[in-house]
Amino acid sequence: MSEHVYTAGAMPRRYAAAGNSSRQPSAASALALAGLCVVGLALTWIVAALVPAAHVRDAVALHDFTLLSRPHVDALANFLLDLLDPALFTLWAVFLIALALVRGRPRVGLAVACVMGLAPLTAETLKPLLAYPHAQVGYTYVAPASWPSGHATAAVALVLSAVLVAPMWLRPAVAALGGVFAVAVGCSLLILAWHMPSDVLGGYLVASLWMALAVAGLRAADRREASRRSESARISRGARRRSARRDPIAPPVPR
């Protein structure tokens, strides 16, 4: 009876663990997503910079967003963008890294440091290398070295890092709120005419690329650790069996 009770109690926990594991993306799927981000980045720049119709449409979309400008709208937009200034962005990164360490997840903390450090750096490096003159509609003007947007990159890097650090049960809420924040930052950049729509999309893709690479690294590390633990357990079991064969338990002495 006790054996059946033990088995029934253990099964839900085992199945729950298996379910959580199956919901985690594998290293291969994360790398595939990173590849899609690279393709998306290339297509976004090629279409925006080299296709005349898209070149003009980009400018028209920017002009349409600037028509939403109002004093209170501009104030809110500036407030959101101020949250991503370098000093504050660094504080967000330090907070998330510290939270990951407190939760006993140093690898996640390292992944957050890489994403929040390398994603904005990538955006700022690409700007002068891929600069091209933008079409202009009305009085809105954006300088050539604007693709991809550093603020859009920072916003998505922050959101994805927060999702990665958050407990599993809290991730849907963090992702939903973070998605609203990232979209609001993108709209703010357009309303204030800081960037073209293609710049914002490029920034989103840069941050997503680095997070996909970080998740691939985490999953590969988890798999190696699980393999090492399994091998260690197998060796330990073998050692116990050999020890038992060498030192059999003596039979009880009859009285």
Predicted regions and their residues:
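Hydrophobic, lipid-facing residues on alpha-helical transmembrane segments of integral membrane proteins
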Residues: 38, 114-125, 205, 209, ...
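Alpha-helical transmembrane segments of multi-pass membrane proteins, especially transporters
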Residues: 63, 111-116, 174-177, 203-204
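Hydrophobic alpha-helical transmembrane segments of integral membrane proteins
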Residues: 107-139
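Structural signal for the C-terminal ends of transmembrane alpha-helices
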Residues: 6-7, 11-15, 98-106, 162-169, ...
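Membrane-embedded catalytic cores of phosphoryl/pyrophosphoryl-handling enzymes
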Residues: 139-254
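N-terminal transmembrane-helix/juxtamembrane module of multi-pass inner/ER membrane proteins
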Residues: 1-88, 92, 127-140
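Interfacial segments of alpha-helical transmembrane regions
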Residues: 28-35, 93-119
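Membrane-water interface at transmembrane helix exits
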Residues: 44, 48, 62, 98, ...
